Amino acid sequence: KVYGMNFKGWSDGSTTYASGADYTMPNRNVAFKAVWVQDQWDGITAVEPTKDEHGYYQISTGAELAYFRDTNSSNWKAKLMCDIGMGGHDFAPINQAGAEFDGCGHTIQGLNVVGDAYVGLFRAISSNCEIKNLTIENAVVKASRDGARVGILVGDVYGSLTVENCYVSGTIETADGTNKIESAGGLIGNVREYSNYSVNIKSCYADAEIKGT
């Protein structure tokens, strides 16, 4: 299996031929190379990913990320197995409370998150959570109601959170251009003040444009 990739066909250097297509051999040697293209989420499909021996979901497509988003477990663990493409389709935030998400050095591309009060790849963190080794590239994150808390990675935090080796870029804006955002940040939209919780951010950066009022 080539994680996150779809087989397109065979190329002779000038033309790509689909699997099973007829080909007339010329009077010379020809070298063919397999052509693979990145899998892109269709905006609808959710597919259950496999779990490894330690109980981590192994996510290799946008459809598997969509399934992970829709699970109800509060003790989730997941790893990205490859770069994944979200196709620019609207994606509701992941609504898990906490646990562990390891990007394993991979990138999420084409992410277009749309939500209401708390908006980001992760909607809100309310218990112990670790997010690490993840890049989100050129995301668009939109809030659809007044008073929203918006970040590319996490919308709102009211639990203990560690974020390490995470890099995000993109745009934060209101869904219709008129909603008022309460708080926004490239990485995290808002962190609530509670004495028994801690938020640690290590070796991370954000390059975000924030639009709206």
Predicted feature locations:
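Surface-exposed interfaces of beta-sheet-rich extracellular modules
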Residues: 1-21
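Proline-rich low-complexity regions
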Residues: 1, 26, 47-49
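Surface-exposed repetitive/solenoidal architectures
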Residues: 15, 31, 35-213
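Solvent-exposed segments in extracellular or luminal domains encompassing
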Residues: 21-29
